């Protein structure tokens, strides 16, 4: 659990070079949603998408652990007279106790976006369809801020990349 990005990269490289078995590599946990979100998760997903042997991973943890107090506030870690502890691991989920999404949920939703766009150079961009489905259900258009160019992105097959100019 919690391998570094460099470790994930090394596993991907070794599998690409057939120095490891060809089973999919799954990160059972690679990020913790404490604070404002899962931290360096984008770097992990760059590595996951770089190698065919990568399968994805899980973020800990889904929902805050807190108790709704009769005054409407949420309580946790030492608020009920129990033995004091560090209290760092109760209100740290992607969703608040009432299931509203936190900032961390927005970050994860962005990480799992179905289409990724990268600037290659000049007027060249790469569109990456991260899903197992065709992009034909989407209409994706590039528009430059000055309105000078508008490009309709062609259908991109599942798990494929298309260059757009």
Regions found by a protein language model. Name each.
Residues 24, 113-114, 154:
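Proline-rich low-complexity regions
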Residues 101-141:
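Surface beta-strand/loop "capping" patches
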Residues 1-103:
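Substrate-binding/catalytic cleft of secreted carbohydrate-active enzymes
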Residues 18, 48, 118, 133, ...:
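Sterically constrained small-residue positions within well-ordered secondary structures
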